[in-house]
Amino acid sequence: MAYWLMKSEPDVFGIDHLAAMPDGTDHWDGIRNYQVRNMIRDRMQPGDQALFYHSNTKPPGIAGLMEIVSEPYIDHTAFDPEAKYYDPKSDPDKPRWYMVDVRYTRHFDRYIPLDELKQRPELAEMKLVQKGNRLSIMPVTEDEWQAILAMEKEGA
């Protein structure tokens, strides 16, 4: 099992949206970065756990947990001219983009803002808090995962 942090804008698709989906499950589409695509396609597996991170909001931070519940598969939204994430260069015979299905696990007892994550020495090496790392999905080590779960309980 691997751990991930997956970013989404809460006004577009936040943890509340995922929780409200049938069975709390939806596809995580719209990835249009090759490095992130490779992580999805080559490394994500059912059973992996993910932190749901709210980005482009004030303050950005971790809102809760979800689980990867499918094998990676072709992101069909790339082929649909009416879709938000349409990619006119994408070809169904040679697909570029992949996605996975995710299932809501739970909201955190308290929201953990990015500024608080940055203050923790045990998270100093976490990709999220390093300058210049703006990827929408990134791996999380087991130690980082456990530290964040412990932070959730502080002051809750």
Predicted features and spans:
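Aromatic- and Lys/Arg-enriched surface recognition patch
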Residues: 64-135
